[in-house]
């Protein structure tokens, strides 16, 4: 949150170089504040679990957030009751005339399919195109990140030899970057995926900044310089037991999965899994809401031209 102090105070310039939001009396007197509108496109099969995970982190900010959930009409969920979807979710036609300060696009268990073979792909592409002029900052997670990069830049996804599953170290690459304010030089987070993207393609096909990476996970988080596009291939939102549930699910399905790395003590699946990423997750989501959304979006969306260039969209 911003702090209001005398603009002549010597500390002001130091704080500003550290990306701490400082305002003087004149700006504070004219500050327009409204609830921030956040849209969550939930593509995960266990809708209610993902809802809780994301809302837990979004609720950490003192800002008021108005949350809407979006689902793909062209896909019927097999694991969430239709009554839940009809009660708590909206369709794209119901939101397409609205403007949102931020949007989160979750992962989805469809990595094994070419993008174009996903049953809701056409509808998904419509949402992503619409977001250019109706959403200020979009946070893409896991498959949502891969799909976003493919649609916007033609970056492909590639099958890995085996599933990447576990808690992995990553280094922050841009000291002082707003999304990583409060982070140490390195952090850990869960990853759970069968596919990856090429760092070379990111460098050759996009002008995005790579913000974190690790030896096992490769590129982890990248973003546009204006923070309107953010791509995260990990799952900072995951609960302590999420990877465990995925592991036992795959065991029950006869898939013979590897034990998630750096997760169970001594690789003993009867032990309680470690939880060592919650502080990083809290920081990341708070930084996204504060720096990419709250401090950047206009008070009145209607004053923005209905054109991506009005936002400096990259």
Swiss-Prot record:
Gene Ontology annotations for the cellular component aspect, listed alphabetically: cytoplasm
Active-site feature positions: 142, 235, 237
Catalyzed reaction equations: L-homoserine + acetyl-CoA = O-acetyl-L-homoserine + CoA
Tagged with keyword Cytoplasm: yes
Gene Ontology biological process terms from the UniProt entry: L-methionine biosynthetic process from homoserine via O-succinyl-L-homoserine and cystathionine
Coiled-coil intervals, chain numbering: none
Principal place of residence: cytoplasm
Enzyme class: transferase
Site feature: Important for acyl-CoA specificity: 111
Pathway listed: Amino-acid biosynthesis; L-methionine biosynthesis via de novo pathway; O-acetyl-L-homoserine from L-homoserine: step 1/1
GO terms, molecular function: homoserine O-acetyltransferase activity; homoserine O-succinyltransferase activity
Its EC number(s): 2.3.1.31
Residues engaged in binding substrate: 163, 192, 249
Function (record text): Transfers an acetyl group from acetyl-CoA to L-homoserine, forming acetyl-L-homoserine.
The name this protein goes by in its record: Homoserine O-acetyltransferase
Organism: Streptococcus pneumoniae (strain Taiwan19F-14)
Gene label: metAA
């Amino acid at each position: 949150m911003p702090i209001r102090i005398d603009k002549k105070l010597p500390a002001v310039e130091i704080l500003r170089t550290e990306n701490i939001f400082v305002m003087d009396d004149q700006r504070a007197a004219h500050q327009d504040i409204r609830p921030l509108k956040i849209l969550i496109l939930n593509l995960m099969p266990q809708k209610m679990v993902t809802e809780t995970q994301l809302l837990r982190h979004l609720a950490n900010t003192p800002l008021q957030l108005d949350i809407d959930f979006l689902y793909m009409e062209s896909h019927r969920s097999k694991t969430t009751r239709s009554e839940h979807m009809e009660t708590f979710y909206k369709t794209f036609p119901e939101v397409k005339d609205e403007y949102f300060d931020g949007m989160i696009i979750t992962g989805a268990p469809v990595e094994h399919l070419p993008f174009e073979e996903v049953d809701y792909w056409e509808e998904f592409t419509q949402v992503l195109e619409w977001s250019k002029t109706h959403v200020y900052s979009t946070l893409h997670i896991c498959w949502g990140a891969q799909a976003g990069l493919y649609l916007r830049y033609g970056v492909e996804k590639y099958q890995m030899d085996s599933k990447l599953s576990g808690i992995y170290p990553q280094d922050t690459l841009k000291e002082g970057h707003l999304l990583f304010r409060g982070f140490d030089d390195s952090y850990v987070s869960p990853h759970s995926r069968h596919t990856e993207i090429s760092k070379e393609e990111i460098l050759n096909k996009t002008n995005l900044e790579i913000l974190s990476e690790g030896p096992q996970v490769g590129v982890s988080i990248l973003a546009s310089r204006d923070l309107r596009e953010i791509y995260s291939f990990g799952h900072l939102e995951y609960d302590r037991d999420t990877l465990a549930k995925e592991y036992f699910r795959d065991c029950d399905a006869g898939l013979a999965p590897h034990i998630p790395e750096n997760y169970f003590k001594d690789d003993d699946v009867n032990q309680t899994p470690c939880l060592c990423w919650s502080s990083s997750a809290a920081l990341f989501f708070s930084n996204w809401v504060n720096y990419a959304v709250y401090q950047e979006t206009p008070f009145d969306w209607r004053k923005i031209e209905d054109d991506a260039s009005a936002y400096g969209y990259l």
